[in-house]
Swiss-Prot record:
Belongs to the QueA family. GO terms for cellular component: cytoplasm. This is S-adenosylmethionine:tRNA ribosyltransferase-isomerase. Its EC number is 2.4.99.17. It comes from Methylococcus capsulatus (strain ATCC 33009 / NCIMB 11132 / Bath). Disulfide bonds: none annotated. GO terms for molecular function: S-adenosylmethionine:tRNA ribosyltransferase-isomerase activity. InterPro entries: QueA, QueA_dom1, QueA_dom2, QueA_sf. It is found in: Cytoplasm. NCBIfam families: PRK00147.1, queA. The lineage of its organism: Bacteria, Pseudomonadati, Pseudomonadota, Gammaproteobacteria, Methylococcales. Keywords: Cytoplasm, Queuosine biosynthesis, S-adenosyl-L-methionine, Transferase. Its main location: cytoplasm.
Amino acid sequence: MLKSEFHYDLPQNLIAQSPLPERSASRLLCLDGATGALEDKSFRDIEKLLRPGDLLVFNDTRVLPARLFGRKETGGAVEILLERLLGERLMLAHVRASKAPRPGTWLALEAEHRVRVVERDGDLFLLELAGEEPLQTVLEQIGHMPLPPYITRPDTSADLERYQTVYATRPGAVAAPTAGLHFDTELLGRLRGAGIDMARVTLHVGAGTFQPVRTENLEDHRMHAEYCEVGPEVVKAVERARGRGGRVVAVGTTSMRSLETAASGGSLRTFSGETRLFIKPGFRFNCVDALVTNFHLPESTLLVLVCAFAGHRETLAAYRHAIAQAYRFFSYGDAMFVTPNEPAANR
């Protein structure tokens, strides 16, 4: 399929610039991929959409304050966006400046911290932090929350809490797994009380999640690599849900990609390593039965994923409905509850 087949026009005023006062107060558009039927609901209605014995799978990655500001030796301003931690003082990062810094040069950061440009690797730079403090500590001191590029306001202290899920425990992401932002502790407690099981995978979301498909033909697109982990407790939880007739509900595209990476052989197994899984129409789903997800950018790999799961025509019709009904889009926006166009292969 072609990238242009996943385009839609979105009014700029529908791009949410800030979160709602309450996490679970968002709207929820339900899409039945088998029929194309749509229902407008509140996110709190997810309690009624889930059944006892269902399994919610969350991504427990924690977003690092991964945006740094500084200056080159010549005085020019630079902006650094961490892509991945490679060690206590090494990172792979995007560097935005009027002119790309050369290997061997130093970049001055806030609070008298400095990083040295070690080498360039395509669009990314290998940077080394000077001194003895671990990079993660320095990020916590002077880093800014890496809000997506379509959020045009400066980050604030409120984003340190709201651009983070309430269950985030494993630092490493530079973008939030945004479907999880709608769950607050009260809602999670009610779901547990209703007999909904829960499990956690880890996928450290990279900045590449915001990159568009760069080739017209989807088959030619190469996905960015992200670290993910599916532990034995997740495998057991899925087996338990299957045994009780429950569904595996992925909270977010990152949870779905983690599960389907680990189930690529046909059945779910433990997994730890990099994934470049690009889920597109024609993909054989082996694990996930339903998906909670936000609305995604036109021509993005994430929109392609939802189309693969719920159907291309059905998904784009749902997006047109969401626009007509003034849903809020993207990271701080509203959500969808999606059931598949076809059931998972192993059901």
